[in-house]
């Protein structure tokens, strides 16, 4: 393994293992028990990996936007932020990817909120402080049983209804241990209980 700082691991439905590191993307080779470095993401800090319901792979990078790998066609596509295009990716520092129960893909960024991918038009819808969110730094998204999306930030916790786009913000004033949450610290168990990690627990 050519990079020791592994940040994320994804095992696909076909059994392939992909590893995101601070120095690029690797794919594990079972037959030779070694790794192939993926040229398309060479030297790129790969923060998160997600396999969507179609079997496509999405890769979040720390400064190079999002990459999508179409497994069937074996083609890559890079989505980048464009200041002149409000329907582009909101920011190139993407730290988390989430697919909800409606099969919608969401991308959380470190500085420009989060966005939803629109497959019909191959573009994005942006959500940030200009739309009433408490921060533009979004660490993690988790869905509850009612379809609400819970977003952790560096300035509180947000409960967001993606259908009505209504939201409620929770802070230490509502009993949170801290308004500052941690990267990738969120989980919903089989009973629907949600666990979210902050700097104070």
Where are these regions (language model features)?
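Carboxylate-rich, polar loop motifs that coordinate divalent cations or form catalytic acidic clusters
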Residues: 1-201
